[in-house]
Amino acid sequence: MPASIQAAAYADTEIIFDWHKVEGFKGGSIDGIKVIVRGTDGAAQTMVGIDLLFATSHIPTPSDGNVSIIDVAPTTLGTTGAAVDTPGWFNNLVGYVPVAAGDFNDADLIYLNIANVNLAGEEIPVSGDLYVAAVAKGALDFRTTARVNETGFAAGAQTVITVDTKDITLGFAPGDVVHAVDDAVLGTIKTVDSATQITLTKANVDAIADSDIIYNVSPIQLILSGTV
């Protein structure tokens, strides 16, 4: 989810993320999904629904007896942060999972929300490469005020990054991939050292300017369970 798009709240019907290839799923079908959604500037969201779409790269050809499979990835839904406006993915679709606002827990976890979706009896078949995309059903807001507090530095310059304006521990954690609001890549967080400092796994990828607001580019996590 590009940092530059997260700089504004998502609205109903907007693409949260376009087709993302799922790596390492072992089952023959998906029978459950956990959806973890990070908060707004370190506080749990007022949750809205999220529509999850699943697609395959294997398109059957029943008119010729399925003697061949068309192996092609789904085409884009459109521009992230805007409504779906691009066709071509119709025959790749294999599943639709509406995750309602009421499926998520309340704000007891303070910093995020989580939902469990049981697909028993409505399992999503998996063959070929598996893809997932998401569309917002209301205002999802991943904006943050955490920003770099350094003299601007070149690509590959440092692993320790000082931040200010927001306690970084509230919205960021080890493993988060962090980009600046202009989509410049800092890198992956190794440790959150204090309220004002993070350490990356390796030196920053792109040049970074002082006061760049930073974003976790994967604020939504999906955990899929399946059966063989």
Describe each region flagged by the PLM.
Residues 16-27, 118-124, 164-168:
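Extracellular and analogous surface-interaction loops
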Residues 38-92:
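Surface-exposed turn/loop modules enriched in turn-prone residues
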Residues 143-216:
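Autoprocessing Asn-cyclization modules and mimics
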Residues 16-55, 172-175:
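Beta-rich globular "head" domains
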Residues 1-10, 119-146, 216-228:
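C-terminal interaction-tip segments
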Residues 2-23, 40-48, 61-66, 78, ...:
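Surface-exposed ligand/attachment interfaces on beta-rich extracellular proteins
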Residues 35-41, 56-62, 133-142, 181-182:
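Short, flexible beta-strand-to-coil junctions
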Residues 73-122:
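Extended, solvent-exposed segments with strong compositional bias
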